[in-house]
Structures are given as structure tokens and as C-alpha cells.
Amino acid sequence: MLFRSFHVGYTITTDKLDALYKQLKGKGVTMTALLAKAVAVTLARHPQVNASGSDTAMTYPERVNVAVAVAMEDGGLITPVLAEADRVDLYTLSRTWADLVSRARSKQLKPDEYSTGTFTLSNLGMFGVDRFDAILPPGTGAILAVAASRPTVVATKEGAITVRRQMQVNLTADHRVIYGTHAAAFLRDLAQLIENDPDSLAL
């Protein structure tokens, strides 16, 4: 039986996240780790988006394992897993990510280091793309595509015109498991975390 995936997009203001990254990158913190941590913390509040399904059953993992897409030099793709990313501190997460990427590119990862993700993150922001949709990997219920953060002219709630840095994120989800309201609520809460309280990610 074929299933239908669907897409939901959201625009997130990243000024506070970018400021936090500039503050912490000298300590080895990566933007990928920051994004993975933000996603994982939000997933812990939205277990439906961390779930997966088949034609006969749904699976609700006890852990939040964020798989992050990494391009290989031979043109392939692998998804190293940041296990329990909602519980691991940001600095350990950054060190773990650096180690996973290094071993992924030398093809030294163990199967459970790339096959146990419960949610996938694909970040093409470093390539400057405005937006993209990611293909849902087997075994997970959703994947989040993250585009570049750019200066954008916006209107404030008070009607003033200002410039803020914003990025577009797009969620691809399995409709057998996740409904549109689940996806929208997850993206809303992710945006609120990144926009209003990114410093909590470093605690």
C-alpha cells in the first residue's frame, strides 16, 4: 500500500540563534548541533512527530535520535545519528557530531550509528538555498529541510519596517502517522524556541 507524504513550511527568525552561535562557536559548538538540539527538545514535546509507521502499525520510540544528512564524496548520502539529542548537552553533542562526520566520510560508522534515527534533519543552509523539500527516508515519520538564514525586510506587529535574519524550514511527513496539525504545532514550537529562547539550548 502506498502512503502519502505531505509538506508544511515555516519561516523562523534567527537573530538570537545566530548571536548564540557566534558566542559559542569558539568553544566548538556547531550550527548543526544547535539545530539538532532545538529539534530534539521540540520533538520531546511532540512525540507524534518523532513516531514512524507502516501499513500495519505505528512505532513511538522512547528516545529522540536525530539523524542528520551528510553528503559523501562519492555522491552518496548517509545519516549519522545524534542519539538522545534532547538529553545530551550542547557541547557533548557538538563533539559527537564532529566525530560522527569524520568517521562517516572515512566509512567507519557502525550500523547503529546511522540506522537508528527517529527523525531526520537535512541542512543545506551552507549552500545558500532559499528553500527545499527533503525526501522522507525509510523508517522515520518526518524529515526537516533547513535552508539558509538571510537578512529579510519584515513588518513588526506595531507596523514598523525592520530587517531581521530569517530561514525557511520545510517538514516532509508521513500522513499515516502525522497529521497537518501535528506538523504545524511542532514547527510553531520550534520557531518559538529558536526565536525567543535559544540560550536554553546551551544550559
Please state what every model-predicted region is:
Residues 1-203:
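C-terminal catalytic/motor cores of large multi-domain enzyme assemblies
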